[in-house]
């Protein structure tokens, strides 16, 4: 579909730009960052939105196998939009194989996430997983995240997205590849220093769990989990059942970052752009095993 778009970086002229972009996130369809991203992208592309009905942070690449999915139109967006009652990976898989199965997208953008997804966080991130799912289907994809939410940081990433769309710098992305873009905590007093191409950090977290006073479900709502005689979990009061204790995950990323990795650049005040691939093969170990096998 060819649409006329205003070139914001020129003197008001118009040009034909047939570009189709699919947007999603893991913070849910009601995220203000999702709306801002859709509005920014609409300046340069024909945009569709398919996002989770509810918050899905930290679900990684999980998807619904036994559970049925449902979807419905979402209102107030400047483009066609739907919510899906599933994970970010569900949204992407469902969008590409069902809602828009006969549609070709030039790019998928996932975000803008509140919280960075640099380094090992990208393994747990629903934001990155949605982009990875798109890459699995051969669609170029970008995950965009903020280390710390602020109007300044959001404005920075939206401008970067618009520049990327205008320049079509994603067009040369290899098949089954995605970009992981993270913006550091920044402000007018401490602006982002620029963008650096980076490797993905392997810095781990010092995770631990603390007992919680109240149990919460994946929506953050209070709930009670009970263990009955046959050891099946229940969520209803029963005097014959034992109430289970609740534990919440705590911890921070260990800050011994390797030089010029995404975590390292963020710590220096730069935005990081890390290319990732769905090919998980360890080349060195593959060669070692082949050599070992041939002996």
What spans do the regions from the language model cover?
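Short, glycine-/small-residue-rich phosphate/pyrophosphate-handling segment
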Residues: 142-170
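A cross-family phosphate/adenosyl-ligand binding-site feature
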Residues: 21, 32-98, 103-104
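Hydrophobic/aromatic ligand-binding patch that stacks against planar heteroaromatic rings
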Residues: 130-134
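Glycine/threonine-rich flexible loop motifs
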Residues: 116-125
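N-terminal amphipathic/basic-hydrophobic helices that include classical n-h-c signal peptides
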Residues: 1-18
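C-terminal accessory domains and tails appended to enzymatic cores
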Residues: 170-174, 184-295
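Short beta-strand segments
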Residues: 50-52, 110-113, 144-145, 181-184, ...
């Amino acid at each position: 579909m060819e649409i006329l778009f205003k070139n914001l970086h020129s003197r008001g002229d118009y040009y034909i730009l047939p570009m189709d972009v699919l947007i999603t996130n893991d913070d849910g369809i009601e995220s203000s960052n999702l709306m801002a991203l859709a509005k920014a992208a609409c300046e340069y592309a024909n945009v569709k939105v398919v996002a989770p009905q509810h918050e899905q942070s930290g679900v990684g690449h999980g998807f619904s196998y036994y559970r049925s999915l449902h979807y419905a139109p979402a209102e107030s967006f400047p483009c066609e939009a739907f919510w899906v009652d599933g994970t970010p990976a569900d949204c992407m898989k469902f969008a590409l194989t069902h809602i828009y199965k006969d549609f070709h997208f030039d790019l998928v953008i996932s975000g803008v996430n509140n919280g960075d997804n640099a380094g090992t966080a990208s393994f747990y991130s629903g934001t990155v997983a949605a982009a990875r799912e798109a890459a699995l289907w051969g669609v170029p994809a970008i995950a965009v995240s903020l280390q710390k939410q602020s109007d300044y940081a959001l404005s920075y990433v939206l401008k970067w997205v618009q520049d990327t769309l205008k320049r079509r710098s994603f067009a040369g992305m290899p098949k089954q590849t995605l970009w992981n873009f993270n913006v550091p905590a920044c402000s007018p007093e401490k602006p982002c220093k620029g963008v650096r191409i980076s490797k993905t950090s392997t810095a781990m977290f010092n995770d631990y769990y603390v007992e919680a006073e109240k149990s919460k479900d994946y929506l953050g709502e209070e709930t009670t989990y009970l263990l009955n005689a046959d050891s099946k979990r229940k969520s209803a009061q029963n005097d014959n059942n034992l109430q289970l204790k609740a534990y919440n995950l705590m911890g921070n990323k260990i800050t011994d970052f390797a030089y010029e990795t995404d975590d390292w650049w963020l710590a220096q005040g730069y935005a990081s752009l890390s290319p990732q691939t769905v090919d998980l093969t360890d080349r060195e170990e593959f060669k070692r095993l082949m050599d070992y096998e041939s002996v």
